[in-house]
From Swiss-Prot:
Source superkingdom: Bacteria
The organism of origin for this protein: Haemophilus influenzae (strain ATCC 51907 / DSM 11121 / KW20 / Rd)
GO cellular component: cytosol
Protein name per its UniProtKB record: ATP-dependent RNA helicase RhlB
Cited function: DEAD-box RNA helicase involved in RNA degradation. Has RNA-dependent ATPase activity and unwinds double-stranded RNA.
HAMAP family cross-referenced by the UniProt entry: DEAD_helicase_RhlB
Motif DEAD box per record, residues: 164-167
Lineage: Bacteria, Pseudomonadati, Pseudomonadota, Gammaproteobacteria, Pasteurellales
GN (gene name): rhlB
Length: 415
């Protein structure tokens, strides 16, 4: 992590439980990020926090540190706890899995057990893990409610509640589920509650007011909505040139880890077909992709076995992927906030990133609202039609496709 991204607050100077402090030091956590520096002095003191922070700012470690500290300092060694003592809710299963992975080193050091509860698959495996005993339950609202209604778990011993990406939970229609679960937990005054959201909108503040105990609000505002470490670039391609321009820029930029966004499932499939035919190691992430395949693709991408993900906004929500070097907006999004969410997947945690957008004939009308929202014009670049690569015959999903991890090679079939 870049030093200029960190604050002057050291973890070692915070009143942390010795086990948590030691685990953080062993993992290489020395200085806090700004959201950690602001939130931890509050949460470690047992007070509720409602924080505004984008993904990639260190908020996950902020609430995990506070959660493990609180459980370790509020446990009776003479008692056995048959039910979870902490509940961490996320809007998507992928984010829940990521949080669980991030918590592993703290769980190992402390002896506290974590378990996952998310829909899609793994029902019996998750159930077995919970029945073996769990201190910290991490999951999505639907599956957690299933287990509560079946009597598999009770929430009456919950000491910590975390709501991550609360604004996305609202967007996905989970607010009724959240309130159901919170009503099953002890009263707000009897637990520590932490809420994090990219925006502290009226509806998020209303939830905090009703279901938290006088939370302290903290906000980490980026210097600009799109992040000053992200290099933005805009092209005006014709519909005819658009795909060839994407392939040409892929050859020119040769991104180490890239996400290409499009507005529809059909367009994503088309992009995947051309990139795969051009020899790129590319995965497709749309709402139709099965849960096991989604997790497999995410692991391949994270491990470096895939270089490119082609995704819709809905399918990519909640994905926390480090070291993304490039984001391509093949289609400008209809929602201006989605532009910020998309390109915010690069340039995280102090690293630099590149965002390249296409203002084509179909979606150029979305550009004025986007530029008004981000507060600046996106620099425009030109291209020469004669220099664009010739399009290969695309792969089709209906046909047999090559393995997604086949060897990547450069294409030299320019016009």
């Amino acid at each position: 992590m870049q030093q200029d991204y960190l604050s002057q607050q050291r973890f070692s100077a915070l009143p942390l439980h010795p086990i948590v402090r030691g685990a953080l030091a062993k993992k290489g956590f020395d200085f806090c990020t700004p959201i950690q520096a602001l939130s931890l002095p509050i949460s470690l003191n047992g007070r509720d926090v409602a924080g505004q922070a984008q993904t990639g700012t260190g908020k996950t470690m902020a609430f995990l540190t506070a959660t493990f500290h609180h459980l370790l300092t509020h446990q009776d060694p003479n008692l056995k706890y048959p039910h979870p003592r902490a509940l961490i809710l996320a809007p998507t299963r992928e984010l829940a899995v990521q949080i669980s992975n991030d918590a592993e080193f703290l769980a190992k050091a402390s002896g506290l057990k974590t378990a996952l509860a998310y829909g899609g698959d793994g029902y019996d495996k998750q159930l077995q893990a919970i029945e073996r005993g769990v201190d910290i339950l991490i999951g999505t609202t639907g599956r957690v409610i299933d287990y509560v209604k079946q009597g598999v778990i009770g929430l009456d011993e919950i000491q910590v509640v975390v709501l991550d990406e609360a604004d996305r939970m609202f967007d996905l229609g989970f607010i009724r589920d959240i309130r159901y679960l919170l009503r099953k937990c002890p009263a707000p005054q009897a637990r520590l509650t932490m809420l994090f959201s990219a925006t502290l909108s009226y509806k998020v503040r209303e939830l905090a007011f009703e279901d938290m105990n006088e939370p302290e609000y903290i906000e980490i505002e980026p210097e600009q909505k799109t992040g000053h470490r992200i290099k933005e670039e805009l092209f005006y391609p014709s519909n005819q040139d658009k795909m060839a321009l994407l392939l040409t820029l892929m050859e020119d930029e040769w991104p180490e880890r890239c996400i290409v966004f499009a507005n529809t499932k059909h367009r994503c499939e088309e992009i995947w077909g051309y990139l795969a035919a051009d020899g790129h190691r590319v995965g497709l992430l749309t709402g139709d992709v099965a849960q096991k395949k989604r997790l497999s693709l995410l692991k391949q991408f994270t491990d470096g076995d895939l270089d490119i993900l082609v995704a819709t906004d809905v399918a990519a929500r909640g994905l926390h992927i480090s070291d993304v070097t490039h984001v391509f907006n093949y289609d400008l999004p209809d929602d201006r906030e989605d532009y910020v969410h998309r390109i915010g997947r690069t340039g995280r945690a102090g690293e630099s990133g590149v965002s390249i957008s296409f203002a084509c004939e179909e979606y150029a009308m979305n550009l004025p609202a986007i530029e008004e929202y981000i507060g600046h014009s996106i620099p425009v670049s030109q291209y020469e039609t004669e220099a664009l690569l010739e399009l290969p015959k695309p792969y089709r999903l209906k046909r047999a496709v090559p393995p997604q991890g086949h060897t990547r090679h450069r294409s030299y079939h320019a016009k």
